[in-house]
Amino acid sequence: MANQEKIEAVALLKGKLETRNNFILACYSGLTVEEITGLRAQLRKEGSEMKVLKNNLFLRALKESGAHKDKNITFGSEYQGPLAAIFAKDNLPAIAKVCKDFAKNNKNLIVKAGYMDGSVLDANGVDAIAGLPSREQLLAQIAGGINGPARTIASGINQIIASLARAIQATAEKNNA
């Protein structure tokens, strides 16, 4: 790759890292073109993007990007060979779940690491966040948790008012009789 092409590739990766600062690194060696295309389609449905990397250029982009330059991220020997970065904005658990489900049927996709909200994750960490509910599910659970006690209070107030109304009705019927 010519020097200018490398500079452009680093700039492109740097831009992706600054707009989508959460990512998963995965080894895709052995996957067919059809399998990679299928994985990319699933990831696009979740608002994510998969980019095949040159490891040294990605490491350089990490060090230069505003979101990651203060972190000491290095690649060890386990990061040799063909790697792809799967970029996500804020839905990394959903992306991790897509990768985990895909890897069940395609043993050649091996998740190596991830980066989420300032924390470097190993393969086990990425696997753990794959089990987390999505952002929408968490918001629904929070709303349900808030709504439940409010509904109980409203029901209790309605019961008090209803029992008061029944007592007044009974008193009125007793006085009329």
Swiss-Prot record:
GO terms for biological process: translation. GO terms for cellular component: cytosolic large ribosomal subunit. GO terms for molecular function: large ribosomal subunit rRNA binding; structural constituent of ribosome. The keyword Ribonucleoprotein applies. Signal peptide: none annotated. Keywords: Ribonucleoprotein, Ribosomal protein, RNA-binding, rRNA-binding. Pfam families: Ribosomal_L10. Forms part of the ribosomal stalk, playing a central role in the interaction of the ribosome with GTP-bound translation factors. Belongs to the universal ribosomal protein uL10 family. Part of the ribosomal stalk of the 50S ribosomal subunit. The N-terminus interacts with L11 and the large rRNA to form the base of the stalk. The C-terminus forms an elongated spine to which L12 dimers bind in a sequential fashion forming a multimeric L10(L12)X complex. This is Large ribosomal subunit protein uL10. It comes from Leptospira interrogans serogroup Icterohaemorrhagiae serovar Lai (strain 56601). The lineage of its organism: Bacteria, Pseudomonadati, Spirochaetota, Spirochaetia, Leptospirales.
